[in-house]
């Protein structure tokens, strides 16, 4: 788990394209405004340009996403400026990826699209029809998928592959979870107001965001201020609609700057200064403290009790036949059929004699496609057919539990947590340096 607060950000490309909602009035207004500017160059990025048409297409997708989330849509000029900055960063990274010789072949793109279709319980042609019904051109969707895969490979090459975590860091992390002072640890319930200002944003944008955050801080510190209402109306985080309530958090799960700030506060007090985090500025209020609910525990893993039905492809059974048979079985199970009986009758896995029961499995044990699908299911829910190297599966989750895990599993969890934290900071630094070394000319007026 990342040791940073999770904040809202304007989505791009593939993520935004997945939203199923009719265009909002704001999106329609954006299209109308952009029509006359369609071919105007709104940014120069090294030897490339971004046009008004490209910008408006992306803005329209994001406006729909915000509406779907019932989040406020920023004023048109502000949203266009934010999205353009993201597109600039994306374009710079694509250029770097090409310079590095990074390519994503068609087979990889098609495999990714197939997984997306499968996750939505559809064949690829059905998924394509849904995307186009949302007003998203399929070629744009495919292009965004290719771009995201390319940028993922670039980040792996330039940043993630260079992150190291020492055994000493792992030992220190585990000790902090169950060390000699663990019994006196307290969980913290916090509320926050977040103003977005990524470290890699232009300095002018950061200055505007800081000015806004300072104004909100003064309002939050004022006598009689309603922090919850202020967060609902002004915070740019996903939890704004909940008044910025983060719930109870252990100190180990929070950025060190936040922990240091609230350590000096009494319940009900607002930290008197802004806290700079990688994505922006934080205003934090301590709601209450309580004794840690599990202060001496080792890092936990979540085990899943799962069963499945496997149909192998080949030996007279085609891909479509295996998938359709599982769709039919799932339909019968959803109508009251017994999963265990179907598994005993049809499954081609060794677990068939146990009704498909795989017992309690830990993270990393099943193949990735199986684990990803399993992790999306609620208790009792049956998946759509899932393709793995073994064939097609129907998966049913029977329950979940926290477990201490083996010493090696605890070390793996600690190493992953430390690595993710380091990688996020390293990526932010690398992206800022990449932008600083690029020629960027913004021709779109900056929203104030």
Curated annotation (Swiss-Prot):
<dbReference type="InterPro" id="IPR050280">
    <property type="entry name" value="OMP_Chaperone_SurA"/>
</dbReference>
<protein>
    <recommendedName>
        <fullName>Chaperone SurA</fullName>
        <ecNumber>5.2.1.8</ecNumber>
    </recommendedName>
</protein>
<dbReference type="Pfam" id="PF09312">
    <property type="entry name" value="SurA_N"/>
</dbReference>
<dbReference type="GO" id="GO:0043165">
    <property type="term" value="P:Gram-negative-bacterium-type cell outer membrane assembly"/>
</dbReference>
<dbReference type="Pfam" id="PF00639">
    <property type="entry name" value="Rotamase"/>
</dbReference>
<dbReference type="InterPro" id="IPR046357">
    <property type="entry name" value="PPIase_dom_sf"/>
</dbReference>
<dbReference type="InterPro" id="IPR023034">
    <property type="entry name" value="PPIase_SurA"/>
</dbReference>
<keyword id="KW-0143">Chaperone</keyword>
<keyword id="KW-0697">Rotamase</keyword>
<feature type="domain" description="PpiC 2">
    <location>
        <begin position="301"/>
        <end position="399"/>
    </location>
</feature>
<dbReference type="InterPro" id="IPR015391">
    <property type="entry name" value="SurA_N"/>
</dbReference>
<feature type="signal peptide">
    <location>
        <begin position="1"/>
        <end position="27"/>
    </location>
</feature>
<dbReference type="GO" id="GO:0050821">
    <property type="term" value="P:protein stabilization"/>
</dbReference>
<keyword id="KW-0677">Repeat</keyword>
<dbReference type="GO" id="GO:0042277">
    <property type="term" value="F:peptide binding"/>
</dbReference>
<dbReference type="Pfam" id="PF13616">
    <property type="entry name" value="Rotamase_3"/>
</dbReference>
<feature type="domain" description="PpiC 1">
    <location>
        <begin position="185"/>
        <end position="288"/>
    </location>
</feature>
<comment type="function">
    <text>Chaperone involved in the correct folding and assembly of outer membrane proteins. Recognizes specific patterns of aromatic residues and the orientation of their side chains, which are found more frequently in integral outer membrane proteins. May act in both early periplasmic and late outer membrane-associated steps of protein maturation.</text>
</comment>
<dbReference type="GO" id="GO:0006457">
    <property type="term" value="P:protein folding"/>
</dbReference>
<dbReference type="GO" id="GO:0030288">
    <property type="term" value="C:outer membrane-bounded periplasmic space"/>
</dbReference>
<keyword id="KW-0574">Periplasm</keyword>
<keyword id="KW-0732">Signal</keyword>
<dbReference type="InterPro" id="IPR027304">
    <property type="entry name" value="Trigger_fact/SurA_dom_sf"/>
</dbReference>
<dbReference type="InterPro" id="IPR000297">
    <property type="entry name" value="PPIase_PpiC"/>
</dbReference>
<keyword id="KW-0413">Isomerase</keyword>
<dbReference type="GO" id="GO:0051082">
    <property type="term" value="F:unfolded protein binding"/>
</dbReference>
<dbReference type="GO" id="GO:0003755">
    <property type="term" value="F:peptidyl-prolyl cis-trans isomerase activity"/>
</dbReference>
């Amino acid at each position: 788990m990342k040791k940073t607060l999770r904040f809202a950000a304007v989505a791009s490309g593939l993520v935004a394209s997945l939203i199923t909602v009719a265009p909002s009035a704001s999106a329609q207004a954006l299209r109308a405004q952009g029509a006359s500017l369609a071919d105007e160059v709104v940014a120069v990025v090294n030897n490339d340009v971004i046009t008004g048409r490209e910008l408006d297409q992306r803005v329209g997708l994001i406006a729909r996403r915000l509406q779907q989330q019932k989040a406020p849509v920023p004023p048109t000029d502000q949203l266009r400026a934010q999205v353009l900055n993201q597109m600039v960063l994306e374009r710079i990274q694509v250029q770097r990826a090409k310079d590095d010789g990074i390519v994503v072949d068609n087979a990889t793109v098609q495999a990714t699209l197939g997984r997306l279709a499968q996750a939505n319980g559809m064949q690829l042609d059905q998924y394509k029809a849904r995307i186009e019904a949302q007003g998203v051109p399929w070629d744009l969707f495919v292009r965004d998928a290719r771009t995201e895969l390319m940028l993922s490979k670039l980040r792996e090459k330039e940043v993630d592959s260079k992150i190291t975590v020492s055994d000493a860091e792992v030992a220190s992390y585990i000790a902090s979870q169950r060390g000699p002072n663990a019994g006196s640890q307290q969980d913290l319930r916090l509320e926050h107001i977040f103003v977005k200002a990524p470290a890699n944003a232009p300095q002018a944008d950061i200055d505007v965001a800081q000015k806004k955050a300072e104004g909100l801080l003064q309002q939050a510190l004022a006598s009689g201020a309603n922090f919850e209402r202020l967060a609902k109306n002004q915070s740019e985080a996903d939890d704004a609609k909940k008044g910025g309530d983060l719930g109870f958090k252990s100190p180990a799960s929070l950025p060190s700057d936040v922990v240091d700030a609230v350590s000096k506060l009494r319940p009900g007090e607002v930290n008197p200064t802004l806290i700079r985090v990688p994505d922006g500025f934080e205003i934090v209020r301590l709601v209450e403290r309580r004794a840690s609910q599990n202060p001496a525990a080792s890092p936990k893993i979540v085990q899943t009790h799962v069963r499945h039905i496997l149909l192998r492809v080949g030996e007279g059974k085609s891909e479509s036949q295996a998938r359709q048979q599982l769709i039919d079985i799932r339909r019968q199970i959803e109508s009251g059929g017994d999963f265990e009986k179907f598994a005993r009758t049809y499954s081609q896995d060794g677990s068939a004699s146990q009704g498909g029961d795989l017992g309690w499995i830990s993270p990393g044990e099943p193949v990735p496609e199986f684990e990803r699908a399993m992790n999306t299911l609620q208790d009792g829910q049956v998946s759509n057919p899932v393709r793995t190297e073994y064939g097609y599966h129907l998966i049913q989750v029977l329950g979940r539990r926290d477990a201490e895990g083996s010493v090696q599993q605890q070390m793996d969890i600690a190493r992953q947590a430390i690595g993710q934290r380091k990688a996020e900071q390293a990526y932010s630094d690398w992206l800022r340096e990449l932008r600083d070394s690029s020629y960027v000319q913004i021709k779109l007026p900056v929203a104030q």
